[in-house]
């Protein structure tokens, strides 16, 4: 019997598929990554080829094992984390998708969403799925495929078609069609899953004309779903033992498994999740209620808020404003001035996300005086990321009644020490940056490792989650509140721009 020394995390993202091998000390041993094609058939439409997703993901698994010289019989289990909401429908007899995957960013089902609102279902959807009515989620995408692909509706009614988010599709392919399953975190992003009963919501399936027979079985995020022989030699079968959507996997990888623990992922936008434990909190402040993972990978509730423009606003300074040659330089220039000199940048380029949800707001720079230079604008742009994060955290605290004790952070922008310190100052809480920033892959690996007994419990992993640096707040309260009031006024200016346009 060969000793099983490793866990593999498959990280299927929006632009690339990755495979990450971890050892027993949660060190990353090997990584392999492949990008795949983004398909834009019409303005606002985004698709992927499901077969290409599977091909890139399975090849990274084989490649990363080969690169590290690790045999498949040394792998204790596989954890999967994935881009959420992206929708795949396939024929279970042929194994072929009936249409491309409709990606989470795709806006083609806006009309269907309007009809759901007109039918008075907004409140029902919020109460029972935790979500707002939006094309972002899977439900209306499934309906679109059944309504628009020739023969799909008939085949679905005849029980020939299956639906899955990306995790479900990968597991189905990796087990040669033996296992049709998803986990609670992915199911909670479909807009047809009832987060109170933890069952598919038959009322919403009926409303969208989706047969229940298409839907996968829903299980916890940490258990053995099936086995795969991909990368296996001589009949080796590797258990697939963990599944979580990318943001929930990051929350778990950051060890935010107890009520009141929260993380912020600073990517193109920012994704904030706060674990609310066994208590479902319905937001009155524009946040989503979703399912996350408790200590053993069981379902727990969370609040989620998204900021549209995080790192993307730094790219704007570089690409459009030409104020930076490299995004990394933003920290250097921001620290060349002591303050932003009363300048606020509101990067509402595509409207404002949580908690405002104002699609018509537009970007503004306010408070300019003759003494303002490019460094002030760079600094104010970085500050805007921290202010927007506070907007969401304030909403989370108001909804849940839970005071945040510390914020865990991950994503590209966390390397910016100025931003992290300012974030701590604005929130008046400590900001913890982990040493291993691959927290999404870590989360998937932890979930799989716990299910197969590779690790005994999260407490065994706690000492592996080493903090690289903690940023402590060090500004007086009066200054903090004064600055934040200025930000709120600046946001009103961004919103008023659209309102004034209506009056013309």
Swiss-Prot record:
Task: State a GO cellular component annotated for this protein.
Answer: cytosol
Q: Give GO terms for biological process.
A: glycerol catabolic process; glycerol metabolic process; glycerol-3-phosphate metabolic process
Residues bound to sn-glycerol 3-phosphate are: 14, 84-85, 136, 246
- List the keywords (alphabetical): ATP-binding, Glycerol metabolism, Kinase, Nucleotide-binding, Transferase
> Which Pfam families does the UniProt entry name for this protein?
FGGY_C, FGGY_N
From which domain of life does this come?
Bacteria
> Might you give the EC number(s) for this enzyme?
2.7.1.30
Q: Where does glycerol bind?
A: 84-85, 136, 246-247
Q: Which GO terms describe its molecular function?
A: ATP binding; glycerol kinase activity
- Give the coiled coil ranges: none
Function, in words:
Key enzyme in the regulation of glycerol uptake and metabolism. Catalyzes the phosphorylation of glycerol to yield sn-glycerol 3-phosphate.
Family statement drawn from the similarity comment of this UniProt entry: Belongs to the FGGY kinase family.
Q: What is this protein called?
A: Glycerol kinase
Organism this protein belongs to: Aliivibrio fischeri (strain ATCC 700601 / ES114) (Vibrio fischeri)
């Amino acid at each position: 019997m060969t000793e099983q020394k490793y866990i593999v995390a498959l990280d299927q993202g929006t632009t690339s598929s990755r495979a990450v091998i971890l050892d027993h000390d949660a060190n990353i041993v090997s990584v392999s990554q492949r990008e795949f094609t983004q398909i834009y058939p019409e303005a606002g439409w985004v698709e992927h080829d499901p077969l290409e997703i599977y091909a890139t993901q399975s090849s990274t698994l084989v490649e990363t094992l080969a690169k590290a010289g690790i045999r498949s019989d040394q792998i204790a289990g596989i954890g999967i984390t994935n881009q959420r909401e992206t929708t795949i429908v396939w024929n279970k007899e042929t194994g072929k998708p009936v249409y491309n995957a409709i990606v989470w960013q795709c806006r083609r089902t806006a009309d269907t969403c309007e009809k759901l609102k007109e039918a008075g279902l907004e409140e029902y959807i919020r109460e029972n799925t935790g979500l707002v009515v939006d094309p972002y989620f899977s439900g209306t995408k499934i309906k679109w495929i059944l309504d628009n692909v020739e023969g799909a509706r008939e085949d679905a009614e005849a029980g020939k078609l299956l639906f899955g988010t990306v995790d479900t599709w990968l597991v189905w392919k990796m087990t040669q069609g033996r296992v049709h399953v998803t986990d609670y975190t992915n199911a909670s992003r479909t807009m047809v899953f009832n987060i109170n009963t933890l069952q598919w919501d038959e009322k919403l399936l009926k409303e969208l004309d989706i047969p229940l027979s298409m839907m996968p079985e829903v299980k916890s995020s940490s258990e053995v779903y099936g086995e795969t022989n991909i990368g296996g030699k001589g009949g080796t079968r590797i258990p697939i033992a963990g599944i979580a959507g990318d943001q929930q996997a990051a929350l778990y990888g950051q060890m935010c498994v107890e009520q009141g623990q929260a993380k912020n992922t600073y990517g193109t936008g920012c994704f904030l999740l706060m674990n609310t434990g066994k208590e479902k909190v319905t937001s009155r402040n524009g946040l989503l209620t979703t399912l996350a993972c408790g200590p053993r990978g069981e379902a727990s509730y969370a609040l989620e808020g998204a900021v549209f423009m995080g790192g993307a606003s730094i790219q704007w300074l570089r690409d459009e404003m030409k104020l930076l040659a490299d995004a990394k330089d933003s920290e250097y220039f921001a620290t060349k001035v002591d303050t932003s000199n009363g300048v606020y940048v509101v990067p509402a380029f595509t409207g404002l996300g949580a908690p405002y949800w104002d699609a018509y707001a537009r970007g503004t720079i306010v408070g300019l005086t003759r003494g303002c230079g490019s460094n002030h604008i760079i600094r104010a742009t970085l500050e805007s990321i921290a202010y927007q994060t506070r907007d969401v955290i304030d909403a989370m605290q108001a909804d849940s009644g839970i005071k945040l004790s510390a914020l865990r952070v991950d994503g590209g922008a966390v390397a910016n020490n100025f931003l992290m310190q300012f974030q701590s100052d604005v929130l008046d809480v400590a900001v913890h940056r982990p040493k291993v920033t691959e927290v999404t892959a870590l989360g998937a690996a932890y979930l799989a490792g716990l299910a197969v007994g590779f690790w005994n419990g999260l407490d065994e992993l706690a000492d592996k989650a080493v903090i690289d640096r903690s940023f402590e707040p060090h500004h007086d309260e009066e200054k903090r509140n004064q600055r934040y009031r200025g930000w709120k006024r600046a946001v009103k200016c961004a919103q008023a721009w659209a309102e004034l346009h209506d009056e013309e």
